[in-house]
């Protein structure tokens, strides 16, 4: 939480940071992994004592008598539909009380939900004061935008209850500008807000006072103070010795005004009397970066200014700007410590390219501050890790050690190209005395450190992904003595026997198949090992595709050159010691790994298929975005073949595919690759002839392209045992309609309206669109015979299609029924008779990137709108079964199977969901 300066929060208001240490235990909250309790009592070790998965944005944490109060915004709620339809997910704020006396068995004790976004909270005794903002459309919120202050009784964590509440309605909700800013003192809360209609009328800013001095939790509405300018940050407000003072910014309705300081006498919470005011010597265009109050002083940092302004507040009725601190550039943060001031910022002056600095100033004479010393560190384009309003929480002083720790990140100095630049994280140590600074070494950290703590002679760094401990007693560079992971980084996975290989955070990790989501893996292979000749390019691993054969994992990923794809082969025969046995760049674009046809064409294949130790990648010349269609090159297609039978010597070859105007994705039958294409008719380019091509890749060095077969439509599914083929055929039809909107609803694909009267889009006319038909064929060596067919609804837009076993699955959105979603299943290939069935999917939103995975007669459905994993069992087409197996914690990027469990990768986590019968 932002610091409150001066006398603010001096009594029983407890520290609310999301990381705390007590009695040798570290309590850390993360939006990715929830709560972790770590034993930090040993100098050379760290040990996870317990965890608790919680999904929300952590705001604050309080620890008292073995109970931890965790405060969240964005806490997920699943709300059942009153009519029995699909449930929906909503978000609120939440207070969660947890018994952490036994970290191995963290137990929920009680909870309380608050509508809106939690912006501020303070605990005093048995009372928790919480401030939420309700924007009017949030779940459970009041109709009008408002800021609500609530006092909660938390003395009995099992019975958290409202004591009192005050709601402040925004006076001009349609013109509301920005979030409210909340500042807290011992006895009062100050809720600052601004309203402006965006026009010529002047806006206004106010500070609403709320008295919170009652130890029983009663809230008393105090004065509403009109102020000049706006208060956009809690840094700007402070209460000291009965005086309210703040630095205000010009509002957007005050383009020529300057920032200023205003002071008020606090007679009582209900009576706030103006005392004094002064403008600051800052250009109107310079936004306020930060303010630090320190007793009778204030330090004001303006954006794009080269100085920190010093303000004398000893005479509250006559605040005065008295000096400035120069000799630095771009100050991010200042830390007053008596008559000394530490300033942290950035510059571009150093000859060695360093861009960050810490400076020490003597401010005993506020009118004439003097720089005593400055230490530069960090490489070019280095930057602070923490966001501005929380920078003070990462900027850590260890007075007992005389050491200052500053987390930062910088571009890798070893990047092989600009495109491969990645950022590395570290913590710079600086020794300090009253008058000196001395640069020490830097500790390299796995992730950007959010908090830094001192524990004995150790420095403990906490990031979103882990905790690391460094020895700092030798006066030189810190030495890492222990580290543990808190979050599982997983962008994609592949199962290999009894292990799971996952990629995330520019690393390749090995986890047991029994516990694939373990934060601490069996082994971790730094992504740099897959790019030894291209340093920094491991940043692209997050988009890699993974394949496995035997004890080897094949990794296909981007490089710093868009014309090449990186291949790495990793031997995981010894899960504790994975090793890269081959790596090289292949001469084709990584776009080929993901590209598939879209639009009106129904294509059920993939861009990459695997036949044992052979990978086959479909390449086309005209994939990608072109600003002008005339710039798109002529369509050509080919297959890139990777023979990986000798992992130490991977071989690449390619074979051209027969000419066509376009090609579908690839399917595989044994060692035969199937792909369909279409060619426009010479005498009628609006019509096309489709062909099925088969390429035998049993010997990838000599692929055999078999004779094409003319088939009605594009490839949807193939059954090798019966040699039967399912296609989607296309026909252009016309129908009379009234109005362009009716035409758009009549056809899902290529709908074009021609009005009977030119320009009359609402009148009668002709609608031209594409009609599609599913067709089942017997496939021979050179010809195909039609067995059965089934027309599709004209309004059914196929969003995605997959081939299963003896059936195909099509995700459909109905253009004629308000986007109703369903899954169409077409089966009967082996039987020779086409059967279809439809499963409606309530609440499913295809625009949110759903993931579909065909598994025999089942389809796994990841709905990323309200993240859930469901299974459609189409074993019996007369009795489809659709069951939601699990809610998911976040947006899922990749799903694969490991036995009877679906592995759902969502970037900062891996969820294993049982999808068995």
Mark where each language-model region is.
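Feature marking well-ordered beta-strand scaffolds used for ligand recognition
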Residues: 1-917
